[in-house]
Amino acid sequence: MAAGKEIKSRISSVQSTRQITKAMEIVSSTKFKKFQALVNQSKPYSGSMDKVLANLAAGIKNERHPLFDGKTEVKRIGIIVMTSDRGLCGGFNSSTLKEMEKLIVANPDKEVSVIAIGKKGRDYCKKKDRDLKAEYIQLIPETMFDKAKEISENIVEYFYEDIFDEVYLIYNEFISALSTELIVKKLLPIERIEVQDNTTYIFEPSVEDILSSLLPKYLNIQLYQAILENTASEHSARKNAMKNATDNAEDMIKDLTLQYNRERQAAITQEISEIVSGASAL
């Protein structure tokens, strides 16, 4: 029964692993529900900001602003890449970082700097010797809005100071518990969304002052929403990965148990045969 003992030991090992993956699945499920609620709460406000900016842009088509118009020549690109702090979430981080590499490869003649949100992105950039402009790790719900505000203020400052000529954002958009979409979005210059709006606006004190106040706030909301959606997507991916691992462990335990019972039955049958043979010889 040496083989049986090995199988029994393997069953015990897989059972221990299953307990760990099940616990992680429960924790991830709880965190996912929390961030799913935050995403749903924030989305209407983010959508309203999109509409306000679109209507405003339609009403000032002839007005110019640096955050709208961009630079005449693009030499330096900033990439904000959002990953997780921890692993065990399937291909969540690897697909995001592959998309970042595609964007870098697509701009061989430009200087590229990265703002990493999440340890996995930070560690990857350090390993690959990418120009890491800033890093933000271990974000918690209570500070996410303030961090988004800090990042948006920094990229606007970098844009005005010609440190960045364009800024891109890479993150996972949350769609449902089973579906997310990897998004690559140009943050700066801000795209003028085309809408049919013939409304005439009167600006006080001036268009320049209003845009200078509104556009950074718009970027702040865009980044905050992206952080929430990316975090919800992360916990969804980890929950699903741990569920798959738990299911696989349960299947493995069933197979090993069946194998153990067969080995045990074969050993018992062998012993009975030997006893019968011995009795016949007598």
From Swiss-Prot:
List UniProt keywords, sorted A-Z.
ATP synthesis, Cell inner membrane, Cell membrane, CF(1), Hydrogen ion transport, Ion transport, Membrane, Sodium, Sodium transport, Transport
Extract the SUPFAM superfamilies matched here. ATP synthase (F1-ATPase), gamma subunit
Q: Which InterPro entries match?
A: ATP_synth_F1_ATPase_gsu, ATP_synth_F1_gsu, ATP_synth_F1_gsu_CS
Q: Where in the cell is it found?
A: Cell inner membrane
* Additional remarks: The ATPase of P.modestum is of special interest because it uses sodium ions instead of protons as the physiological coupling ion.
Q: What does this protein do?
A: Produces ATP from ADP in the presence of a proton gradient across the membrane. The gamma chain is believed to be important in regulating ATPase activity and the flow of protons through the CF(0) complex.
Q: What is this protein called?
A: ATP synthase gamma chain, sodium ion specific
Annotated organism of origin: Propionigenium modestum
Encoding gene (name)? atpG
